[in-house]
Every structure is written in C-alpha cells, then in structure tokens.
C-alpha cells in the first residue's frame, strides 16, 4: 500500500496505537482465529479473494480482518450498525501493524461511531466498491444482518426493472436513504450492480436477521449467489448468541444506566438462543418475565423457572424491557406510553424496528433528551419518562463493547472457514443457502479446547462402529440439537 493511501474514513487515526494494543490482547483470547492463521498461512487459500465485510468494527473484528488478510485476501470493510464501531479498532485497521497515523498502510475501512443513516449506507457502498477490480466490486461478502447483500440485490433488481422506485414510496427513513443511494448510482442503462454481482462467489452471513433475508430471497427465487448461514453453526448460535449475550447484555445496561438490576422486574421478549440471556438478568437478582410466540420456547422458559405471559399483562409493572426476537414491532409507542416512570427499554435483536422508534418520535408533545451518547430519555406530555438505549439498536454494542473476545473467536473462526469453503469450492455450492459443514463446526470447537484445559476422550474403533461414526468425527448428525 502506498504512502498516499487515503481510501478509508474513520474518526481519529491517532487512536491507532491504543487500538493495536487492544488487538494484541484480543489475539490471546481468540485461539481459534490464531490457530487458523498458523494452519493456513502457507497455503494462502484466500489469495485472489476480494472480501467486502459489513460487520461491527470492533477490536474482535479487527482480529478477523487481519486473519483474512493473513490468508491472502484483500479486504474492504464497513460496520453493520451506526453505533457499534470502536474508533480505536477502526483506526488500527486503517493504519495497519506496519503503518503510522501519518502513513496508514492497511485495510480500507469506512466506519465510525454515531454515523447518520446517509453516512452508514455510504460506508456500505464504499466497502462494496473496488476501483481496480474487473467488475468494480468484491468476489466475496462477509455480512452481518445482510445489508451489503441487500444493497447488491436491490441494485440488480432495479437495474432489471429499468428504474428505482420513487423515494416517496419509502417505508421509513432508512428505506428512503437506500432508494436515494440507488437512484444516484443507477442511471439510464446502468449495469453497475449487475456487473458488480456477476463475480461474487458467495456470502457468509453472521446473524439471524440476515439469515432470514437469505432464506426469503431463496424462497422467492431471487438469490444471486450461494450463501453459508454461519449463524446456525453450533459454535456460533450456541456460544456467541448464548454466552456472549449473557455477558454483553448486562455490560450494556450497566454502562448505560448504572442502575441496580437486582430486585427489579425485567421483561425479555423471545426465548431463543439470544433470549436465553434472560439468565444473566436473573443472575443479577432481577425477577425475569418472558414473552413468546413459540410454544416450544415458551415451555422451555416456563421449565427454566420464568413466568411466561404477554406484554399487555406486565407493561405497566416492569422496570426493564429487552427485545431479542429479530422481528419487528415488538414494543410499540402505545406500549411505551403505558410503562412506569424511567422504565428502561433496549434491544439486543438486530435492527431498530423491534422497538417502534419512529412511532415514539411521532407521539404529540414528546421530548427526547440525550443523557449521554446512546442514552436518551423520552418525556411524555404527562411528565413520565422512559429511558431508551442506543436508539433502539443493539445496546450491547452501542452502550458497551459487545461480546468477549473468546466467544467471538468461535463465530469468526466459523466465518473464516466459511469464506475459505465458498471461495475455494465454488463447484460444490450452486446458488442456495447452506449451513457450515459439520466437520468444520467441530473443528472450530476443537481449536478452543486447549485454552480451557479440556481433554477429549477418544472413541475406540469398535465404539465408533457401534454408533456409526468415524473415530475422528463428525459425531452428530446435521439435525442434532445441542
């Protein structure tokens, strides 16, 4: 990279040294990624890969980015959330291990904390723009929430239609910004997005929300390239979603509010892998109530000792409300109007539409006041206030620093192996949505055992034969529920 490298946008390059120190600490806590670097360094399986990343620009993500680069990839990056970027991590990635703030020499990264919606989608566009590539774009996408994948698909769709819908048809502010971006980039006869998509070998998707989008596109017959659903890898969903959320949910609430959780009543919406972080609230001494639509998850919650009921039954009684569903319109403005004075409202699902922030802003006479970044009170005309964290977006990343490095090593090892799988074996993956092969899922788990002092028992050949598996695995069928 030349000394005049300016293909990036971060808040403050002077934070790079601090970021580099934190990255070094994180590497020690991320044995999976570091083992993959050592194993594949010589083979360079991602040589020739142009990876566009749209994933929270944190210290842990910095270790992922530098792992992809160590395996031969070129990388361009944006965050997948307007509040989740850690400025020192972004600066360290832009500067690189061998650069300085005056001479940055590393990865084009476009991310800073507190982006506007226009800035956020501009950053996503920049991450997808590869000036010197044959198609002007990437040949791989690493996504979290599906925004980079969505932008490519919408661009191709509207080029095929010959026009972009009017911004007057936008469903919300974010949709309006997307339409404005595509109106700007799609001119008469333009095939920018179609050309960009033509060389993409696949996408690896990190989270439930993005996976839902992929399955919808597959169902509708519009998916343009193969995808690996990393979210449903066991070493992701049963570790990142479970153990990570237990840690970062409490961290976010504590940093945002400094309230004592013990003795309070908390409502957790959803009891899937993320919602099971309810356990951490209980561990702090809260009385936890769960809402559910799924009878199986509701039964699990009840047998784990939680009261399971509807929001309507408890909306005026609880102190803390946390959405975890990945769905929309979970808490509406009318619900928030019924809450107790200074009730805390937050989300660890994904997008900001789990909580009706648009509806809240339209309540006649309501007043929004910033207490500190990503902590706002909303005062209703009767004087009652509620506290909303991260403007309804991910509180564990907006108000805190996300999941710990060790658990993210699992998820990001999954991502790295999924990228290698799609990039090196395109013939094995026709367009569709796939899960990470079981042997790779087990490999990721193995890479983390030594750090915890785990010693595995080894099957004898006759034992393996008896249960119909190989001595070295995989040990479970794809449909086994851990």
UniProtKB/Swiss-Prot annotation:
Group of enzyme by EC: hydrolase
Residues involved in NAD(+) binding: 207-209, 241, 270-275, 292, 327, 348-350, 396
Essential cofactor(s): NAD(+)
Localization of this protein: Cytoplasm
InterPro entries: Adenosylhomocyst_ase-like_sf, Adenosylhomocysteinase-like, Ado_hCys_hydrolase_NAD-bd, NAD(P)-bd_dom_sf, S-Ado-L-homoCys_hydrolase_CS
Classification via SMART domains: AdoHcyase, AdoHcyase_NAD
Entry's Gene Ontology molecular function annotations: adenosylhomocysteinase activity
Major subcellular location class: cytoplasm
Annotated EC: 3.13.2.1
Pathway involvement of the protein, from the record: Amino-acid biosynthesis; L-homocysteine biosynthesis; L-homocysteine from S-adenosyl-L-homocysteine: step 1/1
Catalysed reaction equations from the record: S-adenosyl-L-homocysteine + H2O = L-homocysteine + adenosine
UniProt cofactor note: Binds 1 NAD(+) per subunit.
UniProt keyword list: Cytoplasm, Hydrolase, NAD, One-carbon metabolism
Family: Belongs to the adenosylhomocysteinase family.
Record's protein name: Adenosylhomocysteinase
